[in-house]
Amino acid sequence: MPLLDSFKVDHTRMHAPAVRVAKTMTTPKGDTITVFDLRFCVPNKEILPGKGIHTLEHLFAGFMRDHLNGNGVEIIDISPMGCRTGFYMSLIGTPSEQQVADAWLASMQDVLNVKDQSKIPELNEYQCGTYQMHSLAEAQQIAQNVLARKVAVNKNEELTLDEGLLNA
């Protein structure tokens, strides 16, 4: 099985919260797709709580679109990482890491402005596979943590995993 790009970076050197360009590709029609690693937690030291990450998934997707879409950028998807340390965001376009960081911070402020759980989008059995597994309080704690710590940039050239550590 091929080694995926996300496993070729040294997770022991990642900063969090931080944004990283995980991958770029060009479609046959010439569009650039950029995948961002939005790292909320320091790998192997912190983890996002299950209910909080799920609620954040519902809120973050819309708020990031509000702040980042436009001027040649359109978000395709924002999905939580299986390791629960962040999200991957795929989009059409090439916004800078700073543009993404600014949109992320604005989105976290939006999360704090949600007044109660009934305001979480798609929070029903028809639109959500585990609609009872949510916590606005946990999502807001995650947002507060990001806002308090700010968002750095993780550079791929600083995170390249030493060949000797691959499959160690």
UniProtKB/Swiss-Prot annotation:
Cofactor: Fe cation
Reactions mediated catalytically: S-(5-deoxy-D-ribos-5-yl)-L-homocysteine = (S)-4,5-dihydroxypentane-2,3-dione + L-homocysteine
Binding site for Fe cation: H54, H58, C128
InterPro entries attached to this UniProt entry: LuxS_sf (IPR037005), Metalloenz_LuxS/M16 (IPR011249), S-ribosylhomocysteinase (IPR003815)
Entry EC number(s): 4.4.1.21
GO MF entry, a single one: S-ribosylhomocysteine lyase activity
Entry's Gene Ontology BP terms: L-methionine salvage from S-adenosylmethionine; quorum sensing
UniProt entry tagged with the keyword Oxidoreductase: no
Superkingdom to which the source organism belongs: Bacteria
Enzyme's top EC category: lyase
Cellular component GO terms held in the UniProt record: cytosol
Cross-referenced SUPFAM superfamilies: LuxS/MPP-like metallohydrolase (SSF63411)
Protein keywords: Autoinducer synthesis, Iron, Lyase, Metal-binding, Quorum sensing
Cofactor, free-text remark: Binds 1 Fe cation per subunit.
Family label: Belongs to the LuxS family.
Subunit structure, as described in the record: Homodimer.
Task performed by this protein: Involved in the synthesis of autoinducer 2 (AI-2) which is secreted by bacteria and is used to communicate both the cell density and the metabolic potential of the environment. The regulation of gene expression in response to changes in cell density is called quorum sensing. Catalyzes the transformation of S-ribosylhomocysteine (RHC) to homocysteine (HC) and 4,5-dihydroxy-2,3-pentadione (DPD).
Name used for this protein in its record: S-ribosylhomocysteine lyase
